[in-house]
UniProtKB/Swiss-Prot annotation:
Belongs to the argininosuccinate synthase family. Type 2 subfamily. One of its GO terms (biological process) is argininosuccinate metabolic process. NCBIfam families: argG, PRK05370.1. SUPFAM superfamilies: Adenine nucleotide alpha hydrolases-like (SSF52402), Argininosuccinate synthetase, C-terminal domain (SSF69864). This is Argininosuccinate synthase. GO terms for cellular component: cytoplasm. PROSITE patterns: ARGININOSUCCIN_SYN_1 (PS00564), ARGININOSUCCIN_SYN_2 (PS00565). Its EC number is 6.3.4.5. InterPro entries: Arg_succ_synth_type2_subfam, Arginosuc_syn_C, Arginosuc_syn_N, Arginosuc_synth, Arginosuc_synth_CS, Arginosuc_synth_type_1_subfam, AS_cat/multimer_dom_body, AS_multimer_C_tail. L-aspartate binds at residues 131, 135-136. GO terms for molecular function: argininosuccinate synthase activity; ATP binding; protein homodimerization activity. CDD domains: ASS.
Amino acid sequence: METILQHVPVGQKVGIAFSGGLDTSAALRWMKNKGALPYAYTANLGQPDEEDYDAIPRKALEYGAEKARLIDCRPQLANEGIAAIQAGAFHISTGGITYFNTTPLGRAVTGTMLVAAMKEDDVHIWGDGSTFKGNDIERFYRYGLLTNPALKIYKPWLDQTFIDELGGRAEMSAFMTKEGFGYKMSAEKAYSTDSNMLGATHEAKDLEHLNSGIRIVNPIMGVAFWKPEVEVKAEEVSITFDEGRPVAVNGREIADPVEMFLELNRIGGRHGLGMSDQIENRIIEAKSRGIYEAPGMALLHIAYERLVTGIHNEDTIEQYRINGLRLGRLLYQGRWFDPQAIMLRETAQRWVARAVTGTVTLELRRGNDYSILNTESPNLTYAPERLSMEKVEDAPFSPADRIGQLTMRNLDLMDTRDKLAIYSKAGLLSLGTSSALPQLGGDKK
């Protein structure tokens, strides 16, 4: 059974993820002219660079859509963002600076909620603007078919007729003008931007070249902190969690997760917190480069991990981080709702996040420069008196206890020395004076 349609489905309803930009506008009008019945669906993801959401469906109707709907995806996106924080679902980082998978989270929400809306309108063919070289074509494919197993995929950008007739932005603009809409192309930027409430992605064009970097980017969620003329004042902020969920900022309770992210974005954005420059592996294993913004996610991540390290033991923290790396890859690959991802996510939410209650106070400066000023929690297992260098009453252990503990280490030390001797005899340990490995003789003493 054919899932991907390579030609316009004439006379059939076709749902298109409609952004209002030139690409989707031209595609919608072109499909209409070819005999399809286009239905337009726009996701409100709280994009910081979108000024008027209500105008987008009106545009779609003007261009020939049979029906146009605006779907509010913000509450779901906010909750998925919090779930990613709770599970540490981030696998891409450079020099300790994290990419918070904000685009994959947005695709998980868009791909499921738009297709669900299409089902309500008896629309079972879906198209979007993703290209064959990127990650989104696979993410949307997976999420769409998970939501509607009967779904067919039609993407104008995979239709050779569309490519031949409207292969570039100049051709699309001329087509829309010819159709009587006078569409004017926006000024070309040196890169492309995709955003949602959780973060922004800047990539392609000039940013494909590694000798071009963050200095050409105009942030849309914060300030260009690298510019000396941009004033950034130090600021204290406190974030409170209750059983793994953020509930207050600077002592003010915020019950709505959407408002929580908007407030954290405002605070973090004033400093340029959460911006990063990453080289990553796309799903098809080719490398790409992106510059990212995520001020609110960065604030939550810093505060949440501070509480995790103060509350949980070393083995739990290690497993949380291992699972988070794996879950981050699954999220990136469009598998956020696959069973293996749900298992990892719910494990973290149940056994890690549930204990994360407390308040972390930070001082934010420029960019990702910050200090942790205070950590408070009723669940802290950090107890300074246990290891105090001062004399304390009711010490948890004595010098004699430590002597006994160290004596027990002799067992594994003997085993280790025996193994090193075996490696030495096998020639695996060099005996040069500069060797960093233990220098053992060949004979056991």
